[in-house]
């Protein structure tokens, strides 16, 4: 297939695929969570490389035989508010696990006047799922996280902390989140 105008660009003297076309091509090699993470990076709200609508159009423009269903599924899961690949992968596990709708990086006010962002927020149930990477284990980050989580819990938010090990057991992770959501539903 010969690339159409706009499908490629010159980068450092080499002709390369456009971001939209490259994302479609990656569907052959990447699993759904990784493909969504790559797409979220491209559409990230603060510094977007391309818009969600443009990626969705690319899915129709660049049909792929292998990975086509995965590509269409990934396009429907993109979120411009995701801020890390692991956060995107966690969101894919949550969404495909059949849990209620979740909002990425929602600002949450507290009674003390502080505002904190939750990685994945089930706003109606006041449940936050936080991905804790190694970045959070330094002394200063750890202290800030403790204060943030304590203040959120004091404002009747449940905070579920997740790490890389949890992503390796998605069924157990979804079940754990579901139990907390169910308890929060009963207590309302």
Model-derived features with residue positions:
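Hydrophobic alpha-helical segments and helix pairs
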Residues: 1-51
């Amino acid at each position: 297939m010969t690339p159409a105008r706009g499908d490629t660009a010159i980068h450092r003297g080499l002709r390369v695929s456009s971001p939209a076309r490259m994302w479609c091509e990656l569907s052959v090699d990447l699993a759904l969570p990784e493909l969504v993470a790559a797409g979220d990076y491209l559409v990230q709200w603060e510094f977007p490389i391309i818009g969600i609508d443009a990626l969705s159009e690319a899915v129709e423009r660049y049909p792929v035989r292998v990975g086509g269903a995965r590509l269409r599924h990934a396009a429907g899961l993109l979120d411009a508010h995701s801020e890390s690949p692991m956060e995107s992968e966690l969101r894919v596990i949550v969404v495909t696990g059949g849990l209620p709708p979740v909002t990425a990086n929602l600002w949450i006010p507290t009674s003390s006047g502080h505002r904190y962002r939750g990685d994945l927020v089930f706003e109606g149930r006041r449940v936050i799922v936080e991905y804790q990477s190694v970045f959070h284990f330094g002394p200063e980050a750890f202290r800030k996280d403790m204060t943030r989580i304590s203040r959120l819990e004091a404002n009747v938010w449940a905070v579920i902390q997740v790490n890389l090990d949890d992503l390796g057991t998605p069924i157990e992770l979804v079940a754990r989140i579901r139990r907390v959501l169910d308890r929060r539903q009963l207590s309302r």
